[in-house]
From Swiss-Prot:
EC number, UniProt record: 1.1.1.37
Gene Ontology terms describing biological process: lactate metabolic process; tricarboxylic acid cycle
Binding site for NAD(+): G12, A13, G14, N15, I16, G17, D36, N98, V121, T122, N123
Keyword Oxidoreductase: yes
Keyword terms, alphabetized: NAD, Oxidoreductase, Tricarboxylic acid cycle
Binding residues for substrate: R85, R91, N123, R154
Active site: H178 (proton acceptor)
Pfam families from the UniProt entry: Ldh_1_C, Ldh_1_N
Catalysed reactions, as listed in the record: (S)-malate + NAD(+) = oxaloacetate + NADH + H(+)
Its biological purpose: Catalyzes the reversible oxidation of malate to oxaloacetate.
Record protein name field: Malate dehydrogenase
């Protein structure tokens, strides 16, 4: 009996797209189609990855292409296409340029892969996932933005390093938009099951240091851009996308913070915003509504309003 492998299409063959292609093949999550509008780049990266298969120990197929038709009947699609942030540039500066790219991508998903589960990575994330949703006509449960998983990973890493403990013992997540107004929920963070607030009371870390970590988390992407001088983060964004993809393909039902479509949850309607969701074989299977205190609610509302303004300024 022949086992039909999943088909995973990656739209954009830049740094994140290339890293994603390598990770998908190494994990043998499915056959890969690496798409980019620039001739030669997806073909070259796909060939490079394919040539590593004898020593990498994977047997899935990977092709590079400039034809949208090759993404036909994909099981899952991850979108990283668009221009990347440069030093001094905010995610919002990317808005109009990348919105046009997302419109084209969305229209082709609608044409060739209307049943795929789609993960959007392109910035400014919360607005871009709205554009893809609009032009792809995908059901709201089958499209999601990758942001909260990455922001939460940064938050967890910074806490672990400061406490000098394993990152695996740190549980924390971030709500809201993927930008300066994101809301790392300190009250919900825990260390090996012990609330972070108690860890502060024990004197293992100060509130001031936690506040610094929150600020660093908000500026996590900018910090890497400033260090690289050219380009932006790609290993952590790619890893975060794979985490979400695996939960869908393997029906793991992981609870992950993602930019998802809200239709009344959290008092928000018709907007993609970062909240915890369950991802399984049916895509976004449930939105979890976390109760917030007054301060957290105020920050969340500010983040929601920032995303609303961003979406409103789209000229499509």
């Amino acid at each position: 009996m022949t086992v039909q492998r999943k088909k995973i299409s990656l739209i954009g063959a830049g740094n994140i797209g290339g890293a994603l292609a390598h990770m998908v093949t190494l994990r043998e999550l499915g056959d890969v189609v690496l798409f980019d509008v620039n001739d030669g780049i997806p073909q070259g990266k796909a060939l490079d990855i394919a040539e590593s298969s004898p020593i990498g120990g994977f047997s899935v197929n990977i092709i590079g292409t400039n034809r949208y038709g090759d993404i036909k009947n994909s099981d899952a699609i991850i979108i990283t296409a668009g221009i990347a942030r440069k030093p001094g540039m905010s995610r919002d500066d990317l808005l109009q340029t990348n919105a046009k790219v997302m419109k084209e991508v969305g229209e082709n998903i609608r044409k060739y892969s209307p049943n795929a589960f789609v993960i959007v990575v392109t910035n400014p994330l919360d607005a871009m996932v709205s554009v893809v949703h609009k032009f792809s006509n995908l059901p709201a449960n089958m499209i999601v933005g990758m942001a909260g998983v990455l922001d939460s990973s940064r938050f967890r890493y910074f806490l672990a390093r400061e406490l000098n403990i394993s990152v695996e013992d740190v549980s924390a997540f971030v709500l809201g938009g993927h930008g300066d107004t994101m809301v790392p929920l300190i009250r919900c963070a825990s260390i090996a099951g012990i609330p972070l607030t108690q860890i502060i009371d024990m004197g293992l870390i100060t509130q001031e240091k936690v506040d610094e970590i929150v600020k660093r988390t908000r500026n996590g992407g900018k910090e890497i851009i400033d260090l690289l001088k050219s380009g932006s983060a790609y290993y952590a964004p790619a890893s975060s996308s794979i985490y979400m993809l695996e939960s869908y393909l393997r029906d793991e039902k992981r609870i992950l913070p993602c930019a998802t479509y809200l239709n009344g949850e959290y008092g928000v309607k018709d907007l993609f915003i970062g909240v915890p969701v369950i991802i399984g074989k049916n895509g976004i299977e449930k939105v979890l509504e976390v109760k917030m205190d007054d301060s957290e609610q105020e920050m969340f509302n500010k983040s929601v309003n920032a995303v609303k303004e961003l979406v409103k300024s789209l000229s499509l």
